[in-house]
Amino acid sequence: MKIIVAEKISASAVAQLQEPGWTVLTADQVHGKLEEHLETADALIVRSAVQADAKLLEHAKKLRVIGRAGVGVDNIDLEAATHKGIAVMNTPGANAVAVAEQTLGMMLAMARHLCRADALMHAGKWEKKSLQGTELRAKTLGIIGLGRIGMEVARRARAFGMELVAHDPFVSVSVAKEQGIGLAGLDELYAAADYITLHVGLTPQTTGMINQASIAKMKKGVRLVNCARGELVNEADLAQALQQGKVAAAALDVFAVEPPKNSPLLALENVVLTPHVGGSTFEAQEAVGVQIARQVKEYLKHGVIQNAVNVPSVSAEEYATMQPYIVLAERMGAFLAQVSEGSIEEISIRYSGHIAEWKTELIRNGAIKGILNQALEEKANLVNAAAIADARGLRVLESHKAKASTGGAGSVLSIFLKSSSEEHMVKGAVLHGDAPRLLHVDGIDVEAPLERNLIYLRNRDVPGVIGKVGTILGEESINIADFSLGRRAAEKDSEQPREAIAVVHVDGRVPEEVLTKLRTIPAVQKAKAVRLF
């Protein structure tokens, strides 16, 4: 075996790879010759600097695995790696303790004015009165996102005697309760929390979630921490709230643009700023190196796949057949998650027709992935989706009915989603070649494309709704690519308007203010923007 460690990891991590007959080349040994050495390599280990793109992977004639010492895989071309049969693994959670400790450290820095106290002392000033702080004890900490890092923060905050409330639609009440955490909606959390810390991934729904509107719902004097993703915070809105006193202090380790040369936060005294060092501890860097070395070794020796981000457990032929249905399942799941409210408790998937006779694990995982990735900090994929759902206490049920009626579609996929407040069901199929299509939503038949940007409307079936929707979208310069309609069957002898739905495929993102206008149409009961990929 030949293993290339293309970037610096610890000596103990490299030692994990030593086996009789194995050749391990370090970064110094392959410097300037990576492409040449890659021709005969079985494994490649990288951090974030080496770009394992399609061009580099052209040299990988026998490469079996790429190990990323860290979480992000933006520097690895997953499509090219998958096409060449190369497994890609990362090390999620290895730096969770480091980021959690950074979060608590920033909370203490805000509570006790530690940064300003240090600066005053270095300036030769002894100003005790202006530095009186507050305790963390008995304060309420609002945690947005209860993944690995969020849970580590919760454990440490509990030791400080803090009250814990969290928002995470993908964690069950029972799992949260075991950790002494109360679950709440975002608005409820905003209203209750003295401190708020962010630990969610960056999605269309979470981008800019801390903004003027959300800050207005928070307590006066709230303190904010962001050690997750810079783009979660609208920095201009936060700066204004800090200047006005609505937000007492903020602590940020991440920024929308790094380094943040023009951020309005740089000039404010009540802000603690660090240069994206949340995961930068000796222990965390040691942990990611040792963990990826062990994973690569296990894969090369025994074929054991851990923390893979791209590997299906089926043959290439089987994967080619089911791939359109994996896409269908993922988009149906994403659609459901974005039209639903409340904390998700149960996902039920039914396979009807030919699809019921297949190995359906990847299709199931596609559906779970589509649902979970609307809010998760740690991204689910076709390998780990079911495990993440299980760890978060979500029930996942499946049923197979090969002889069920499919209305001529050959195979139909049905997904039921139950949350703490409502239930939804959608059906879909692959039609017109490999096109994923929506066939049914909550008792109403409709055929609609599952494309990138959609608007989902539920309304009373009365004249004028379609025209008003079209007018509003036209006024907002939003182009309609497809307008699919469906309505519930009329009840006998009833004069009440039927319920109808519309799935509108548009050419770009739909701003919240457009949805607000759509909701002003008297007959419209629900208007949601859905972004599928």
Feature locations, PLM:
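Short beta->alpha connector loops at strand-helix junctions that form conserved
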Residues: 27-28, 47, 69-70, 85-97, ...
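A conserved regulatory-domain signal marking ACT and ACT-like small-molecule sensing domains
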Residues: 313-356, 360-533
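Glycine-rich adenosine-cofactor-binding loop
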Residues: 7, 92, 137-157, 325, ...
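Oxidoreductase and adenylate-handling cofactor-binding alpha/beta cores
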Residues: 100-119, 139, 158-162, 290-304, ...
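An N-terminal-biased, well-structured beta-alpha scaffold segment characteristic
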Residues: 1-89, 211, 491
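Rossmann-like dinucleotide-binding domain for NAD(H)/NADP(H)
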Residues: 84, 88-89, 169, 221-339, ...
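Phosphate-binding beta-alpha-beta segment of Rossmann-like dinucleotide-binding domains, i.e.
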Residues: 84, 92-140, 148, 152-159, ...
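Rossmann-like adenosine-cofactor binding region
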Residues: 50-57, 169-264
